[in-house]
Amino acid sequence: MSYKFRAIYTKPSNEVSLHTPPAGLYDLVDTMFNEGKITQKPIRTTDGLNETFEIVFANEAAYNEWKGSAVVHENKTTRSEHCNANSISYSIEGPI
């Protein structure tokens, strides 16, 4: 069973940007995609001030590997600090 997760951000204005993920996050996505552990790389959709990213993992084990990664934890901290400092609300949904 695949695991789909969605991150939804709502910015206070168009002048505010989302955080910049650590470079290692892109490497992890590529590696896990090439290994078949990610079946859909993150897809970004924008609707006004709302931005959504959706990623699909092959199974629960692949997702657990992802969330246990040091670079994912680094990204989580960076995202939280940036969103709090810039009044960006966000939620993580999944599995959906």
Could you describe each region identified by the protein language model?
Residues 1-52, 56-70, 88-96:
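Short S/T/G/P-rich N-terminal loop/turn motif that feeds into the first structured element of a domain
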Residues 75-93:
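Conserved short beta-strand edge segments in small beta-sheet-based binding/regulatory domains
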